[in-house]
Every structure is written in C-alpha cells, then in structure tokens.
Amino acid sequence: MRNRSALVREIGPWRGVLLIALLLALVATGSTAARERPITVFAAASTTDVLQRLGGRFERDGGAPVRFSFASSSLLARQIEEGAPADLFVSADEQWMDYLQQRSLIQTATRRDLLANVLVLVAPKGRGFPVTMKRGFDLPGAFRGRLAVGDPAHVPAGIYAKEALQHFGWWEALKGRLDSADNVRAALRLVEMGEADAGIVYATDAMASSKVVVLAEFPSRSHAPIVYPAALCRGARPGAAAFLAFIGSAKAAPAWREAGFRLAD
C-alpha cells in the first residue's frame, strides 16, 4: 500500500489543474444559483390566470423562474411599503402605483401602462335579471339580496364600482346591501356560491367563470379609466426587467386578449 508521501508526490503536478477545476465548478454553481433565483411578482388578483400562464411560458423559453403573489393592489402596495421582497408590481389602478412611486419604492423609469379592463354587473348563473345601464333604472329594486364588490375603501374594483353606482344614482340605496370583499376574485366567488345575488367585477373575471352570467357592462364614462400599470420595484433583480418586457410584448398580447383584457394604448 502506498504511503501518504508517495501519494502527495503523485498528486503534486496536478494540484494546479485540480484547483482550477474546483474554482470553475464553484463559479458555475454560483452562476446557476443566481440564474435560477426566482423573480417575485406582486400582481392584482384579476391578472392571476394570464400571468401564471405567461410565467410558465417565460421559464420554458429560458427565463428565470417566476413566483407570484396575487391579492388586491392595495394590500400588495402596503406589503411592498413594509419591505416585502417584490421585484415587479402590477396594479389594477394607478392610485396604488402612485402610492409606491411617491415613496420611491418603484423604478419610475420602468413604469408603463400595461392593460385596460371593463366593469360588469354579474349574477349567479340561472339567476339573472334584466338591467338597463341608464339613470332612472331602478337597479336596487331589480334584485332583493346582497351586492358583492371589492371593498370600496381600498380595492380598485370596489372603488370603480362605487364610482359607477354613484354615477347612476344607485349608491345610496345599495351601500347598505354591499358584501365588501378583500379583492375582486373574492367578490366573484361570493356570486359564484350564490351568497350574493349580484356582483360588480371586471369583465375578465366574469369570463374566467362558468358560474356567473354578465347582466350588463358599465359604460366607461361612469367611472375612472381602468388601467393596469406595471413597474419594477426598487432593488429588483435583473431578470425582472426581462419578465416585464415579456408580459408587455406582442408575444404575450394574445394571452391577454383571450382573457378579455384590452391592451393599454
């Protein structure tokens, strides 16, 4: 059996080669780890279905892994303010993007209007009723139960809903019958389960559900424009810029349109 000294003499000439190989392996491992580190996207609940599909496609095309946190824009903005590690924020209104911009929590130069949406009145499937979107129509008298909306105090869909109800003169009669939800998808679920007799959600949410029927579309003049801005957060990882570019690209446009979104001008 060879002694330790003999073994050292044999390895000696190869010591430099082995060291270089080890260093290269460590660099490669570090590079792979950095490349695979996920991008964290905070996005409005109404974008859930499309962004999950686009995230998977982005990864299959060689992009960094993407993980999502979907909730109301207000909740997400406050979480970012409190230090939550988000790389990209997609809001369902300009107010909450402005909120972060005023606090220097997004990279203003990357901010862009990504999408637009439409507000609709829905009911559980099989329980629809006639609705006319004009002043003088008695919407409060057209149904007896609860009206599901995003919380008008902070949820964008609820804020738009309140504006639309005020526009037509229905707010005072209906505000005591509201079921206020934490986000627009939660409001939709209340209608799907029959816990609310009607709801105000985005057209894209209604399209994603087989359990509700659209009764009418609120005209755009009845509320502020429904615009979805997106921006990189302060300190975002480099891969996040590529994902922002991807979701706003022509390659992603068909997925948005298929879900009922309108591309921002």
Where are the predicted features?
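Bacterial N-terminal signal peptides that target proteins for export
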Residues: 2-18
